[in-house]
Amino acid sequence: MLRYTRNALVLGSLVLLSGCDNGSSSSSSGNPDTPDNQDVVVRLPDVAVPGEAVTAVENQAVIHLVDIAGITSSSAADYSSKNLYLWNNETCDALSAPVADWNDVSTTPSGSDKYGPYWVIPLNKESGCINVIVRDGTDKLIDSDLRVAFGDFTDRTVSVIAGNSAVYDSRADAFRAAFGVALAEAHWVDKNTLLWPGGQDKPIVRLYYSHSSKVAADGEGKFTDRYLKLTPTTVSQQVSMRFPHLSSYAAFKLPDNANVDELLQGETVAIAAAEDGILISATQVQTAGVLDDAYAEAAEALSYGAQLADGGVTFRVWAPTAQQVDVVVYSADKKVIGSHPMTRDSASGAWSWQGGSDLKGAFYRYAMTVYHPQSRKVEQYEVTDPYAHSLSTNSEYSQVVDLNDSALKPDGWDNLTMPHAQKTKADLAKMTIHESHIRDLSAWDQTVPAELRGKYLALTAGDSNMVQHLKTLSASGVTHVELLPVFDLATVNEFSDKVADIQQPFSRLCEVNSAVKSSEFAGYCDSGSTVEEVLNQLKQSDSQDNPQVQALNTLVAQTDSYNWGYDPFHYTVPEGSYATDPEGTTRIKEFRTMIQAIKQDLGMNVIMDVVYNHTNAAGPTDRTSVLDKIVPWYYQRLNETTGSVESATCCSDSAPEHRMFAKLIADSLAVWTTDYKIDGFRFDLMGYHPKAQILSAWERIKALNPDIYFFGEGWDSNQSDRFEIASQINLKGTGIGTFSDRLRDSVRGGGPFDSGDALRQNQGIGSGAGVLPNELASLSDDQVRHLADLTRLGMAGNLADFVMIDKDGAAKKGSEIDYNGAPGGYAADPTEVVNYVSKHDNQTLWDMISYKASQEADLATRVRMQAVSLATVMLGQGIAFDQQGSELLRSKSFTRDSYDSGDWFNRVDYSLQDNNYNVGMPRISDDGSNYEVITRVKEMVATPGEAELKQMTAFYQELTELRKSSPLFTLGDGSAVMKRVDFRNTGSDQQAGLLVMTVDDGMKAGASLDSRLDGLVVAINAAPESRTLNEFAGETLQLSAIQQTAGENSLANGVQIAADGTVTLPAWSVAVLELPQGEAQGAGLPVSSK
């Protein structure tokens, strides 16, 4: 074990580099801290270094863009399309004229010279910072968002380079960097190998290194830092397998005497030059590969965070590139009570320090001294622990905590078990998942104690409308609650005095958000009204031309308590804003109390939505950047050329393909599984994870709970060049589930990215496609039949090998049914498919029906459309999934993406009075292009009221009761589905809108699964007129007892079964017809030969 201080590391680096020198075996009497005199010195081309074009004066900032192409071109460059996107936020608000719309490209250069354009930016103050994105049109020239902090650049005059996220103090610095070190296209992939296309066939290729500053040309244009000579080699098979997207790069070998351990603690730059030393190219080096190669094996064996054991506390953090790490301990009032240097383990790259048991409950942070390639500086800052299990308010400090402390457990916690088994495929197939958000559950429920609304403990309010409603759903067959993100999130302020929710006085909003005082709503600051009351006033005159509700709600969103939570800050701590006290351990016990209430009182298992595909932020300056401050450029997925953090997910993409982040994910899941008794995990954007990493994590967690279930969004992420992604098709046969977009789109109509008239044109099976067209509908009969095929396939669990008769009368496997160029069927078992027609993403089902339904469809018809759509999920094979409030006709007033639309647009009313329809135009930034369509359709039908909400709730319970009434609805096994499930009314002459699924339990199917039945029929009539089935002549079918009991309130009300077996289905109806079993198993409803 070696402990380095920063000074020791600097000294060590000089010894290292004088030893490894330039790779030459000859001795040298020259200065050991400079390259050998006999080697060619690399230098810049002979181009004059620029001064500033302009400098900022009072209340101004200046940004120069240094343009290398323009400098070296013989003709004048055109900068007319270059522009800045500028915005204020809570932490950076110095702009006097932010840009309101991303499509506004009017902030063009104030001027230019031969070195590039510049912008003079007006400020409202000379302190703080500004947010900047440099663009060409609306295309980013620099992938990362830039923050210019005036504390760092006191003259407020800076320079940037396209493709480089660094901000430079002067044009001279940026010029040298641009002509010197640009991009980050070299990859150090293992201890011996560097990959770099820029070095191919170049006479001189070197790896330069600096431990204390950036590698750059000096005042004479020369590169005088230490370096290693690199020699050409070939890409090994192992490297090619680990980094397939880099396998075509030129490969170089490092000298055998290179000290990797110390080289990684400073800046490394790959440089290629001509024989005479004139620089050809220079680039920063990405080091994630070598970090894994050098440290991961030893590091994976260790535990991290603050661990209580053996009468003390061990603090451990993995920070192999850090020059120094200290544990800084704080008292409850956040005063420093000690700073302790940590010891570095050279094998693992981990730093640790052992403290006493008196530190239990103490707050702490890590003080880092580490080189960060984004700033190209050795940074010093404090950062919270990524392995923290408890936090202070607003996640500013980590806290030492023992999760096994009995004081943090509700009574009976240790004996808590899951109410629904998850051991077998048949168990999993019974899952009916109710996706919920903590605030949506109780923020509006007046029967929940005021102090618990929007909190974990609202689920313990047993007499509340919300809890009673969930109990009713549970009794009818809903088995699981899925909680949208409940880990520590970055986008809700936990300091209550900084927050204003719409239930509070408008004056409070004005206090916490100064922008309101200068807005069109300033007059309400002294009104005495609540924000909600003002919104209710505004909605009366809200329109596409005057969308006041969304304008005010946008201001509310800046300081309210609402966010979906897909903004991970600390992965393994419950979110504090949902606790009655966000400080310290209260959140832990209250979270556990909620889990206990859901399992014991509601009788449901708990699934947790996890978001490991991105972090909220990255870089050395953002408050919510954690991992990237500790091991810079390791935990984030970087662009292979620029080194910028990718943002394909939404935010700062993470890199689960790197071993130590894969470990962090598995360690985090283990805590949620063992310490919080979570029964399943839903992975956000799972396609951004490697399949191997997801499978490895599952195996790790199954060792703790063999019955755990994994599923997620298996959309194609376009990361297949890097690794085999965890996508729908790739996960076939693994047992891991993925959401199916096939049934979703066929039933809802269109796709999730439709906008404008396309939202109305593209009807689905559930909204009248082919049977009740609206005025814009343009689907052909063939297209309607194809939608029906996709719906049938979805009801059969989207199995790749399921054989069905398609729209043309041909027998096809599921994998041969087209879905936008991809296989319609992709799964091996129905438990690998999660079917849905509504979840938190995109518009609610009610809003989509409102977009698409014909004006002829009255309110009663639309309620039944909702039920018919949900029936395809609830009565089909596969796992059933639904969004909270679908049973209440939930509307978000046409909002496509309500992640930050607050309590106003996300309201769920458990008093069953209001479904939140037509409460104002949705956010203009997302839905502005839909305003004209919304205006046309929103008044086509009356707003649902109590009668409609009660009716839909009854329909919903009918469907869930039917689902749990027979194991034939939940077969679980792919071979069983193919042996038992079939469809009638198929082919080219089918009756449009009519779906008829049979499930056999007769002798040909094998052993009887339901002793009551020889088979059943699911008949869905998604049409405005009755349909007649003649396929069951001679069969003694009878309506399900559940639907018979429901009588005139049933979705099957009016179904007629003639003596000869002919079945007549009324419009917009759902019927489950049972074939009773006699004294012995009968012939059943066998699958037809195809």
Swiss-Prot record:
The record marks 841 as: Transition state stabilizer. It comes from the Bacteria. It holds the Pfam family CBM_48. SUPFAM superfamilies: (Trans)glycosidases, E set domains, Glycosyl hydrolase domain, Starch-binding domain-like. GO terms for biological process: carbohydrate metabolic process. It is found in: Cell membrane. This is Pullulanase.
